[in-house]
C-alpha cells in the first residue's frame, strides 16, 4: 500500500509508524510500558491490510482503525482497544 484515504477524501502516503504510534498511545493511556507489543500488533494489522488490499489498494482510515481494534481485542488487549476507540472519536 502506498496511500490511505483520509476522512476528508484526500490521499495521503501510507505510514505504518502512524499505526504503531496510535496503538502505543492507547496502550500508555492504560498503563502499558512495552512498545514492542504495539509494534507486534501493528505488524499484524499490516499483514491483514496487505492480504486485503495488496500493493495497489487504498484502505480508508476507518478500515485501518477497524482492523486495529479487532487485532487488539484478539490479542487480549481489550483495555487498549477501548482507549483506542475513545481516541479515534
Please annotate each region the language model reported.
Residues 1-89:
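Long, C-terminal-biased catalytic regions of enzyme "large/alpha" subunits
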